[in-house]
């Protein structure tokens, strides 16, 4: 069994006198910085000067400064920037101001694991990765609970890296829900696999194929949209709350028998073999090398062509009209 921690097993004392420099103020940076501040830690925010994030962080009551200055002042440098800009900002602003005994902290380990950032040996390398979006991290904290996190130490120069890691996790509220020990390698490879094979890539492809199958079978696109896409959330919510068998116990007998006997026809051994191919391409660096090459040569255009194709698909056109009906006041 994996090592776990709960809130009452952890103290903030080891980091209460340290300065936490949050680098970046996007969805995770905003949530984690505010949670740590509300937990009584000394938080500063490092940002590019003059941007919207700077003004927002100041409005939220934070002491805001350049990334370079935040690195100088911080004891724990908590990097919450988008993956693809971490390497350059580290090289230009963080590395020149990083001194012995500080900690580089992350919520995703890709930059260290794939060596986009090559950290020195005289700092701690730690990770606190909430298993949910920043909005949920903040929302659950304010509800006096939290979003669970997986935590890891890659390099313990000071001998206090775990105290720092667990302190950050407690301060953002994650320890209230529970912490699970992992490793940088495991976090990166499983996170990317989840995104590609089921959570984003696999789920989107499955839904699209189901929609196309119904429409090609002569059914109305609007009905196909409900069956293939809209109702998925109801099932996922049950699986998340009660487990897979808990979901089966809460659907109709017809759905239970049909799903149990036909699901393996849809997701068969060939599907699992393809998942293994995806995992292998992550493990051996194929995906990382492809993604870096594509991003460096094309930037966001690396995925724009795929997004454009999706925008032109019937499921998107029908979906926009269906969502207007169900959420008339919302904008997309």
Stretch-by-stretch model annotation:
Residues 2-63:
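NAD(P)+-binding Rossmann beta1-loop-alpha1 motif at the extreme N-terminus of oxidoreductases
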Residues 18, 40, 74, 101, ...:
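Short, well-ordered alpha-helix to beta-strand connector turns
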Residues 59-69, 132:
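Glycine-rich, highly charged phosphate/nucleotide-binding loops
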Residues 68-118:
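Rossmann-fold NAD(P) dinucleotide-binding segment
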Residues 105-196:
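Rossmann-fold dinucleotide-binding core
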Residues 159-163, 167-173, 178-217, 222-240:
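Active-site-proximal catalytic alpha-helix in oxidoreductases
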Residues 222-332:
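NAD(P)-dependent Rossmann-like dehydrogenase/reductase catalytic/cofactor-binding core
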């Amino acid at each position: 069994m994996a090592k776990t921690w709960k809130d009452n097993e952890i103290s903030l004392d080891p980091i209460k006198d340290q300065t936490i420099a949050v680098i970046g103020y996007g969805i995770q940076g905003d949530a984690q910085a505010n949670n740590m501040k509300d937990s009584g830690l000394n938080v500063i925010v490092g940002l590019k000067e003059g941007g919207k994030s700077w003004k927002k962080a100041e409005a939220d009551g934070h002491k805001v400064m350049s990334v370079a200055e935040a690195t100088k002042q911080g004891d724990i440098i908590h990097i919450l920037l988008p993956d693809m800009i971490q390497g350059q900002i580290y090289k230009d602003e963080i590395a020149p101001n990083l001194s012995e005994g500080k900690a580089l902290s992350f919520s995703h380990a890709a930059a260290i694991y794939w060596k986009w950032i090559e950290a020195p040996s005289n700092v701690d390398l730690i990770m606190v990765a909430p298993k949910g979006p920043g909005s949920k991290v903040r929302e659950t904290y304010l509800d006096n609970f939290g979003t669970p996190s997986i935590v890891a130490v890659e390099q313990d120069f000071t001998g206090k890296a775990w105290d720092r890691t667990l302190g950050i996790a407690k301060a953002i509220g994650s320890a209230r829900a529970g912490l699970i020990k992992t490793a940088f390698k495991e976090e990166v490879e499983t996170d990317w696999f989840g995104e590609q094979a089921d959570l984003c890539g696999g789920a989107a492809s499955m839904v699209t194929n189901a929609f196309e199958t119904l429409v090609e079978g002569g059914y109305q696109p609007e009905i196909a949209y409900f069956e293939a896409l809209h109702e998925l959330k109801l099932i996922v919510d049950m699986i998340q709350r009660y487990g897979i068998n808990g979901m089966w116990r809460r659907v109709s007998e017809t759905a239970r028998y049909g799903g149990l006997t036909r699901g393996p026809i849809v997701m068969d051994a060939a599907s699992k073999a393809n998942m293994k191919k995806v995992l292998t391409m992550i493990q051996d660096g194929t995906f990382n090398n492809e993604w870096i090459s594509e991003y460096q040569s094309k930037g966001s255009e690396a995925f724009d062509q795929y997004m454009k194709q999706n925008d032109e698909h019937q499921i998107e056109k029908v979906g926009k009209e269906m969502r207007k009906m169900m959420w008339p006041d919302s904008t997309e």
